[in-house]
């Protein structure tokens, strides 16, 4: 691992990364519990579940898992190709809009509707989000796949023990916070499914609205403080 320069940890980017990993865990738990044991973010899990199902002759939800995997891949591919035209490079927050709108719609779709019409579109939106957001404070991370983040955590802590450079310690702590955020999203979603069942997904647009409003208020507060200091 290369030697990292000391970085000033951006509170804004860290909050956003924590929020995105929380949402990824939240949506994954929802689709796994409510929508046919399928994951929209953890595609490795889908491959394992699909393979085991095929061996055990349990192919009832195989099509949904295959379409979920393909949809996620298409989301990543399309955003990579068109992100500059869609202004996602300058405003990656725009990639959250499809997920928010779709979650709002799915919250009112009954469980009798086939999951192949529900989970793949969510996976497509998750592909957009995980492609648009790829770093926090200049450190690459993934808001959907925790295996890579776990590896980066241990690499960072290992490098800190070896070199005693504080930058590695800070990086390791960032990844720990991301892992905890993902777990909290899973736990929170799993608990809410007991109460709200399929409507649990409505928590996504609600949380996004609150988070976006807090970002706007924080930005306005900073601008106001700058004006006061200037005067």
Question: What do the predicted segments below correspond to?
Answer:
Residues 76-89, 193:
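Helix-to-loop junctions at the C-terminal end of transmembrane segments
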Residues 93-106, 205:
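Structural signature of the two symmetry-related core transmembrane helices
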Residues 1-13, 226:
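Short, Lys/Arg-rich, polar N-terminal cytosolic tail immediately upstream
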Residues 69, 73-77, 179-187:
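Hydrophobic/small/kink-forming positions within alpha-helical transmembrane segments
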Residues 13, 17-60, 129-170:
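Small-residue-rich hydrophobic segments that form or flank transmembrane alpha-helices
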């Amino acid at each position: 691992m290369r030697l990292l320069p000391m970085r000033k940890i951006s509170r804004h980017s860290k909050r956003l990364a924590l929020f995105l990993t929380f949402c990824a865990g939240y949506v994954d738990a929802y689709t796994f519990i409510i929508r046919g044991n399928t994951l929209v973010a953890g595609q490795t899990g889908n491959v394992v579940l699909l393979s085991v199902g095929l061996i055990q002759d349990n192919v009832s939800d195989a099509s949904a898992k295959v379409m979920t995997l393909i949809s996620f891949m298409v989301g990543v591919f399309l955003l990579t190709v068109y992100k500059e035209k869609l202004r996602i490079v300058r405003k990656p927050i725009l990639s959250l809009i499809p997920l928010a709108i779709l979650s709002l719609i799915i919250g009112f779709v009954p469980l009798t509707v086939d999951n192949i019409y529900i989970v793949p579109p969510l996976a497509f939106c998750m592909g957009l989000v995980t492609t648009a957001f790829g770093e926090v404070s200049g450190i690459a991370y993934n808001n959907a796949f925790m295996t890579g983040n776990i590896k980066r955590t241990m690499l960072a802590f290992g490098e800190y023990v070896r070199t005693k450079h504080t930058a590695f310690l800070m990086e390791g702590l960032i990844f720990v916070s991301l892992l905890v955020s993902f777990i909290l999203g899973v736990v929170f979603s799993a608990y809410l499914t007991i109460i709200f069942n399929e409507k649990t997904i409505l928590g996504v647009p609600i949380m996004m609205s609150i988070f976006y409003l807090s970002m706007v208020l924080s930005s306005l507060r900073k601008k106001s403080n700058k004006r006061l200091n200037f005067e």
